[in-house]
Amino acid sequence: MARLAGVDLPRNKRMEVALTYIYGIGPARAKELLEKTGISPDLRTDNLDDDQLSALRDVIEATWKVEGDLRRQVQADIRRKIEIGCYQGIRHRRGLPVRGQRTKTNARTRKGPKKTIAGKKK
């Protein structure tokens, strides 16, 4: 089983799809990565040789933050916004949607289950 950036890539998937299992690499970045390394997108993960695997590893480490580093960076950005007290930081602190979505209805994922108020009738 091929292992890149601390993630076991699925054996029987095409490389284009298998690379998206790494946090921080989506379909577009996977295509770009395969073009840089000259690996066919249709190649299966279990058909990779060691040279191709090391080429992928080198390009990923040199070019992008992925997995743990990226997760830490995102959390640090959120903490910084909370500390400086900007609008997005306040929304994070209150557990509300950050990017301008409506909250009168919807937003249940972010707000959690409904809190019923006793004595409120129509």
Curated annotation (Swiss-Prot):
Gene3D superfamilies cross-referenced by the UniProt entry: 1.10.8.50, 30s ribosomal protein s13, domain 2 (4.10.910.10)
UniProt keyword rRNA-binding, yes or no: yes
Presence of keyword RNA-binding: yes
Keywords: Ribonucleoprotein, Ribosomal protein, RNA-binding, rRNA-binding, tRNA-binding
Alphabetized PROSITE patterns for the sequence: RIBOSOMAL_S13_1, RIBOSOMAL_S13_2
Highest taxon in the source lineage: Bacteria
GO biological process: translation
Molecular function GO labels: rRNA binding; structural constituent of ribosome; tRNA binding
Region (Disordered): 95-122
Pfam families in UniProt: Ribosomal_S13
Entry-linked InterPro entries: Rbsml_uS13_C (IPR027437), Ribosomal_uS13 (IPR001892), Ribosomal_uS13-like_H2TH (IPR010979), Ribosomal_uS13_bac-type (IPR019980), Ribosomal_uS13_CS (IPR018269)
Any one annotated GO CC term: small ribosomal subunit
Function according to Swiss-Prot or TrEMBL: Located at the top of the head of the 30S subunit, it contacts several helices of the 16S rRNA. In the 70S ribosome it contacts the 23S rRNA (bridge B1a) and protein L5 of the 50S subunit (bridge B1b), connecting the 2 subunits; these bridges are implicated in subunit movement. Contacts the tRNAs in the A and P-sites.
Quaternary structure and partners: Part of the 30S ribosomal subunit. Forms a loose heterodimer with protein S19. Forms two bridges to the 50S subunit in the 70S ribosome.
Family, as annotated: Belongs to the universal ribosomal protein uS13 family.
Database matches in PANTHER family: 30S RIBOSOMAL PROTEIN S13/40S RIBOSOMAL PROTEIN S18, SMALL RIBOSOMAL SUBUNIT PROTEIN US13M
HAMAP family: Ribosomal_uS13 (MF_01315)
Protein name: Small ribosomal subunit protein uS13
Gene: rpsM
